[in-house]
Amino acid sequence: MPAKTKEPVALVITGPTASGKSALAHEVALRTGAEIISADSRQIYRELTIGSAKPTPEMLGEVPYHFINEKTIGEPYSSGAFATESRARIAMIRKRGNPVIVAGGSPLYLQGLIEGFSDLPPADPKIREKLQKELAEQGSRALYRKLQDLDPERAATLDHTKTHRLIRNLEIIELIGKSSKPPSPTPEMQFHAVALNFPREELYQRINLRVEEMMSEGLLQEAEALLKKYRPEISNRTLPALLTVGYQELFDHLERKTPLEGAVTLIQQHTRNYAKRQLTFLRNRMQLNWIQAPLTAQERTELAESLLS
């Protein structure tokens, strides 16, 4: 890989869920006067607060954040749109003379911003209709197995519940023979990107604890309000944002399909599975500098200082 000669336009801090990237980014921003670009595909939605682990109101008051609470869940928002809009925001922030930090763990958001996307074919209604029929008749697990056979690397970044992305990837394979072309470089912007590495068992313990904390903060009540407002969309699975881990399990509980204790256990399990997929994507599909995640506030302060040096 050729050396990058341009000055990085932003520091990127990523890693699996619950690895401490948001707290680290916030501390660096406080020390530098930076503005933070959230690369989290759920924090952009106003209605998803506790389950998306948004920064607290106090944090939002201390540091300028972008792509937090900017959309409603009825507004579709893609990784391509984020890549375009976040680059424009970065240019605007730097024009003001402020540093930029990108923080988040949504893999496609990060890949699109840092590496760019190749042009992909538009949706084909006939192919999509056929795949939707397969989904209805065979179920999402059958479509997932199909993607595993055709593109195991891409399948490793998904699971069978991500039906919109499953269908899109299978559609692209039918159109061009593979689910995605190699990313297009974006030489006009270079990034200093670090990823937080966490011992697997400790990460899983943090995930379990975080879910318990979210429940204490009112995640069940947040899910109940969403179910009351969006029951048809939840039943028909027409809004991808409402398929988010942490909400769909509680919707099932509220519909009397799962006891609460079982729903919480499933949230923990599914979040651990998501962290595993994040790690697979970040390690195999992106060029990142992996560093040891801080385990204490003191270690976080020391790491923040090292990132500034």
From Swiss-Prot:
Signal sequence, start to end: none
Gene this chain is encoded by: miaA
Complex and partners: Monomer.
PANTHER family documented for this protein: TRNA DIMETHYLALLYLTRANSFERASE
Organism of this sequence: Chlorobium phaeovibrioides (strain DSM 265 / 1930) (Prosthecochloris vibrioformis (strain DSM 265))
Catalytic activity: adenosine(37) in tRNA + dimethylallyl diphosphate = N(6)-dimethylallyladenosine(37) in tRNA + diphosphate
Described function: Catalyzes the transfer of a dimethylallyl group onto the adenine at position 37 in tRNAs that read codons beginning with uridine, leading to the formation of N6-(dimethylallyl)adenosine (i(6)A).
Keywords of the record: ATP-binding, Magnesium, Nucleotide-binding, Transferase, tRNA processing
Listed name of the protein: tRNA dimethylallyltransferase
Start and end residues of each stretch annotated as Interaction with substrate tRNA: 40-43
Stated family: Belongs to the IPP transferase family.
